[in-house]
Design a protein with these regions (language model features):
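Glycine-rich, basic loop-to-helix element that forms the pyrophosphate-binding segment
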Residues: 63-79
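Short, acidic, metal-binding catalytic loop of nucleotide-sugar glycosyltransferases
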Residues: 23-32
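Conserved donor NDP-sugar-binding/catalytic core segment of glycosyltransferases
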Residues: 96-125
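Catalytic beta-strand/loop signature of glycosyltransferases that borders the donor
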Residues: 116, 185-192
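Short aromatic/hydrophobic "clamp" motif used to bind/position activated sugar donors
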Residues: 84
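Catalytic core of nucleotide-sugar-dependent glycosyltransferases
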Residues: 194-198, 203-231
């Protein structure tokens, strides 16, 4: 039997998405997989639909408001499997995602494994899995955090997610995992997620731009020396001088 995966979803006032998410989660999980849903202080508290309440593979943890980084750490800390997959409540996993990423991580246990989304431009979808250097993230973030899968040992080695950042939590974790746990970044060639692209429905779209820019700079500066100099760093500096906005992903 292929290695089991635990799907981690943190939820804050996301009950409007729960029915669609529930149907998708049940379709996504294989017999050996598990899911931990962490209600991060929703008001009112999240109530699972019957399709999830009756599924022994799925666990709900209800917590006070922690913030996404601490909520992810609490959920992952409760995992019993060696493999973790992240999925937002408003995004959908596509058939075969967990099997594909579990197989990839069996061959590359040091990897953070990402996939494209259905909505990505075809030009950025390449045949075959490709490794992406950590310094590439200094130009833009090419990854969807809802597509991430990794070995739990990477999370342990990285020291978990940062619990104090107002945003850029995922970017920080990627660079933290590379610099502290020796993780490599890999993008599979098959789209395995469908994203919610409505900015009005995405929590971090409401972060004020000045807070985002300041936090982004803090995160990039935090790991710059460990990531090392490369042509990506040169390109990032050129874009900054030319006033070109940095690309981002969820």
């Amino acid at each position: 039997m292929a290695d089991p995966v635990t799907v981690i979803t943190t939820i804050y006032n996301g009950s409007r998405f729960i029915d669609g998410f529930a149907r998708n989660l049940v379709q996504t999980l294989r017999a050996q997989d598990r899911a931990i849903l962490l209600d991060d202080g929703s008001n009112p508290p999240l109530v699972l639909p019957e399709i999830l309440r009756s599924d022994a593979r799925i666990k709900l943890i209800t917590a006070k408001r922690l913030g996404r980084g601490a909520a992810l750490n609490l959920a992952i800390g409760n995992c019993k499997t060696g493999l973790i997959a992240i999925q937002d409540i408003d995004d959908l996993s596509l058939p075969g995602r967990l099997a594909a990423q579990a197989d990839f991580l069996a061959a590359r246990p040091d990897a953070l494994s990402f996939t494209p989304a259905q909505s990505d431009w075809p030009i950025i979808r390449r045949k075959g899995s490709r490794q992406i250097a950590p310094s590439r993230l200094y130009v833009s973030n090419p990854f969807h955090h809802s597509s991430l899968a990794f070995h739990r040992d990477i999370w342990v080695g990285a020291g978990g997610y940062d619990t104090n950042l107002p945003c850029c939590i995922d970017l920080d974790f990627y660079l933290r995992a590379a610099c502290r746990a020796g993780a490599s970044f890999w993008q599979l060639d098959t789209p395995f997620i469908a994203r919610n692209l409505d900015p009005a429905e995405r929590f971090y779209a409401a972060i004020p731009s000045d807070i985002y820019r300041a936090t982004l700079q803090t995160v990039l500066d935090r790991y710059r020396a460990d990531v090392g100099f490369s042509h990506w760093m040169i390109l990032a500096m050129m874009r900054t001088k030319l006033g070109i906005a940095r690309g981002t992903r969820g």
